[in-house]
Amino acid sequence: MPTTPERIRHVLARVQVLLLEKNAAYGDSALEPVRIFSKADPVEQLRVRIDDKLSRVVRGGSQADDVLIDLVGYLVLLLVAQERAEQAS
């Protein structure tokens, strides 16, 4: 039976793989959005995506595990976006 630290490493590895695969497929679209419709900055756009994921968790409509992994991924991206914003100012 895996230990708690092993489980944490496993979950974080899944999040890392997901983020790197999406970054390879879509580029930095979460951190550098095209802004065709919304003019919100990347931090605000990520907060909107996180709200959407939290709504799905509350409703339980999607595969719960996938939604939670996506949510953790968006939270990581939010931290990256906030760090970028702080460095730019």
Which residue ranges define each predicted feature?
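Intrinsically disordered, low-complexity regulatory regions
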Residues: 1-89
